[in-house]
């Protein structure tokens, strides 16, 4: 399928007169959001494309953590700062950046250092693309941001799986110890998921149980994106229906999967 997708993307004209198609991807911590996005990009044949010419790009909400004060940074280094709260993100910059993307502008994305809990001086340049995937635990929390997405995906993975993934990730990639990870999870991550992330699941057009392992759902999404890129009949028709999947069928599929809590 990847080969066919790559050929399709190479031949298409930019949809809707150049306006990019924004897709929001939400879900709990370590639910597989970035893996789902990476799988979509892979199946669309974009992995080997030069970054200046990519037609599908991924942005992460994690890049937009606020610059912390000295006091906040000291708490963060002890695992006592809540990075899962909406106020932890620079929401004004997120909104400004996404609006500029919808206008077809080249944007500069911050780079966040999860070891030192600080924003680096360098930025990443993102050039105009046809499809932009924006993933994050609170991607749907702000209505202003949420309303910019033409398609909204929620990655629904059970709590035990998410916790085990987070432990492995934070130890190997972020230099944390197990005690700190578990304390932070119980104190901040789990309560924030239940209060801020899980309630936004209702805004999703498509719910993806089991994340990147759910190839059936991902292939349907890829097919829909291909239709959008080619200006097909399903272009921008995502609210309530995706390739024949109605809202009621969507909910039934999500209810049959494991709930996070």
UniProtKB/Swiss-Prot annotation:
Summary of subunit composition and partner proteins: Homotetramer.
A Pfam family reported for this protein in Swiss-Prot or TrEMBL: PRK
Matching SUPFAM superfamilies: P-loop containing nucleoside triphosphate hydrolases
Pathway involvement of the protein, from the record: Pyrimidine metabolism; CTP biosynthesis via salvage pathway; CTP from cytidine: step 1/3; Pyrimidine metabolism; UMP biosynthesis via salvage pathway; UMP from uridine: step 1/1
Enzyme class: transferase
Region (Disordered): 1-24, 236-261
Listed EC numbers: 2.7.1.48
Binding residues for substrate: 84, 112, 117, 166, 176, 184
Gene Ontology biological process terms, A to Z: cellular response to oxygen levels; CTP salvage; feeding behavior; response to axon injury; UMP salvage
Encoding gene (name): UCK2
PANTHER family xref list: URIDINE KINASE (PTHR10285)
UniProt: ATP binding residues: 27-35, 213
Identification of the protein by name: Uridine-cytidine kinase 2
GO cellular component: cytoplasm; cytosol
């Amino acid at each position: 399928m990847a080969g066919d997708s790559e050929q399709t993307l190479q031949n298409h004209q930019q949809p809707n007169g150049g306006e990019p198609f924004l897709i929001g991807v939400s879900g709990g911590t370590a639910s597989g959001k970035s893996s789902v996005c990476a799988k979509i990009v892979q199946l669309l044949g974009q992995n080997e494309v030069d970054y200046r010419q990519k037609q599908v790009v991924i942005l992460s909400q994690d890049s937009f953590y606020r610059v912390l004060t000295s006091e906040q940074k000291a708490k963060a280094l002890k695992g006592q700062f809540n990075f899962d709260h909406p106020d932890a993100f620079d929401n004004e910059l997120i909104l400004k950046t996404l609006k500029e993307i919808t206008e077809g502008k080249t944007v500069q994305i911050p780079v966040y250092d999860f070891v030192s809990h600080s924003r680096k001086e360098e930025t990443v340049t993102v050039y105009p693309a046809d499809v932009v995937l924006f993933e994050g635990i609170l991607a749907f929390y702000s209505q202003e941001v949420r309303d910019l997405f033409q398609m909204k995906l929620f990655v629904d993975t059970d709590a035990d799986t998410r916790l085990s993934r987070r432990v492995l990730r934070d130890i190997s990639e972020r230099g944390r110890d197990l005690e700190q990870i578990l304390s932070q999870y119980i104190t901040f991550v789990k309560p924030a998921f239940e209060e801020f992330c899980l309630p936004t699941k209702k805004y999703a057009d498509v719910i993806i149980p089991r994340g990147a392992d759910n190839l059936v759902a991902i292939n349907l999404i890829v097919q829909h994106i291909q239709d959008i890129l080619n200006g097909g009949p399903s272009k921008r028709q995502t609210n309530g229906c995706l390739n024949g999947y109605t809202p009621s069928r969507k909910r039934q599929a999500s209810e049959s999967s494991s709930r996070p809590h």
